[in-house]
Amino acid sequence: MNIKPLADRVLILPAPAEEKTIGGIIIPDTAKEKPLKGEVVAVGHGTKDEEMVLKVGDTVLYGKYAGTELEVEGTKYLIMRQSDVLAILG
């Protein structure tokens, strides 16, 4: 399925949650923190007031409660406004 975000929205594939701590303790699914990092997989065309800075392939940081979760063909994504992205990792 092809998803094209509208206006100033971006589609992000969240990074997988950590399975183990640095000390080697396995983290159960119920205790895992929601990932705050992911890869941009699609971007909208922007608005007349906001140019799109993010590009497909950018790795970004976003807030804990940013975006709306959606699942497509078994893969979980987040869709959010570009302004909800805190930083681009380089």
Curated annotation (Swiss-Prot):
GO cellular component: cytoplasm
A Pfam family matched in the record: Cpn10
Protein location: Cytoplasm
SUPFAM superfamilies attached to this UniProt entry: GroES-like (SSF50129)
Record GO biological process: chaperone cofactor-dependent protein refolding
Keyword Chaperone listed: yes
Keywords: Chaperone, Cytoplasm
GO molecular function, one term: metal ion binding
Function: Together with the chaperonin GroEL, plays an essential role in assisting protein folding. The GroEL-GroES system forms a nano-cage that allows encapsulation of the non-native substrate proteins and provides a physical environment optimized to promote and accelerate protein folding. GroES binds to the apical surface of the GroEL ring, thereby capping the opening of the GroEL channel.
Subunit architecture: Heptamer of 7 subunits arranged in a ring. Interacts with the chaperonin GroEL.
Family: Belongs to the GroES chaperonin family.
Protein name, as recorded: Co-chaperonin GroES
Organism this protein belongs to: Bacteroides thetaiotaomicron (strain ATCC 29148 / DSM 2079 / JCM 5827 / CCUG 10774 / NCTC 10582 / VPI-5482 / E50)
Gene name per UniProt: groES
